[in-house]
């Protein structure tokens, strides 16, 4: 039985790998994609997502989502992914268009039509998910769980303590973490370990058409290097869905700092229970790196 999922994303070079895995992993049934501003503007993330769907010749509904955070000015990660979000490969022209409704309404409608609760996977800022939960609370029973790439129990990657996806819209993340839905958080504690080695990266051009495309994108990706290895942050959320045994999880109370002068966007992960509050998130704290790398190689070999 394949697991039905909806994927909220902001492609993004490592998003491209996660999208490939979500589409072609046999255990998963990707039924809806939505885009959000994050790595680059929502117009660019939508264009990039549609380019990938056309590249693989798959027909998955896609809705464009939030262009700006809930309350603050937007920020991006073009310095990591390039100005287009997926620099390095020339995709062919196409005439695909997103659905005519906002992402959070597309998620609502698809949830209400689904015959069983659906797993949401969010690998960008959580703006669309916060809009869904705040504007359509009747949807909560139809969400099986939310798996996110975001946050950190320790160091950040865009401030000393904050991870980019959370820091891009802390108010949205706070809304989601307080919602009461089941959440699995794959943050920097595991994603910084999720490295594809230079030796493996060198094999991609000979693997298949997708391998050639990803190798070209990776040459412009700034989360590591082709010489030292590249971190596959977003792919961890997909990996947990099908290979949860690769991850060490701990239930923790997690809150999002929205006020601090230096700490805004930080996920406060109460690993030791100091605050005495009930756990609201299952936090991934460690990763079987060899097992992850083997799984990635298996999945990418399945992609055309």
From Swiss-Prot:
Gene3D superfamilies: Ribonucleoside hydrolase-like. The active site is at 233. GO terms for cellular component: cytosol. It comes from the Bacteria. It is an enzyme of class 3 (hydrolase). Keywords: Glycosidase, Hydrolase. Its EC number is 3.2.-.-. Pfam families: IU_nuc_hydro. GO terms for biological process: purine nucleobase metabolic process; purine nucleoside catabolic process; pyrimidine nucleobase metabolic process. Hydrolyzes both purine and pyrimidine ribonucleosides with a broad-substrate specificity. This is Non-specific ribonucleoside hydrolase RihC. It comes from Escherichia coli O127:H6 (strain E2348/69 / EPEC). The gene is rihC.
């Amino acid at each position: 039985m394949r697991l039905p999922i909806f994927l909220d994303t902001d492609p993004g070079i490592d998003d491209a790998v996660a999208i490939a895995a979500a589409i072609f992993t046999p255990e998963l049934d990707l039924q809806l994609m939505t885009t959000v501003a994050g790595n680059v503007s929502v117009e660019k993330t939508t264009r990039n997502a549609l380019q990938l769907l056309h590249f693989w010749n798959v027909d998955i509904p896609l809705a464009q989502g939030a262009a700006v955070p809930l309350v603050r000015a937007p920020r991006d990660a073009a310095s990591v992914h390039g100005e287009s979000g997926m620099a390095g490969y020339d995709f062919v022209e196409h005439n695909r268009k997103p659905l005519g409704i906002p992402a959070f309404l597309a998620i609502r409608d698809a949830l209400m039509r689904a015959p069983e609760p659906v797993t949401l996977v969010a690998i960008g800022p959580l703006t669309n998910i916060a809009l869904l939960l705040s504007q359509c609370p009747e949807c909560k029973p139809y969400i099986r769980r939310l798996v996110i790439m975001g946050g950190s129990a320790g160091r950040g990657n865009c401030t000393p303590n904050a991870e980019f996806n959370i820091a891009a819209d802390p108010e949205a993340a706070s809304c989601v973490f307080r919602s009461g839905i089941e959440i699995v958080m794959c943050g920097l504690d595991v994603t910084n370990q999720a490295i594809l080695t230079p030796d493996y990266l060198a094999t991609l051009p000979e693997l298949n058409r997708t391998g050639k495309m990803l190798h070209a994108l990776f040459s412009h990706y700034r989360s590591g290097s082709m010489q030292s290895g590249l971190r596959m942050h977003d792919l961890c959320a997909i990996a947990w869905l099908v290979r949860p045994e690769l991850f060490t999880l701990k239930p923790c109370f997690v809150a999002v700092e929205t006020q601090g002068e230096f700490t805004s966007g930080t996920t406060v992960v109460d690993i030791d229970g100091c605050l005495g509050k009930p756990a609201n998130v299952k936090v991934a704290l460690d990763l079987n790196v060899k097992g992850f790398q083997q799984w990635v190689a298996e999945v990418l070999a399945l992609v055309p």
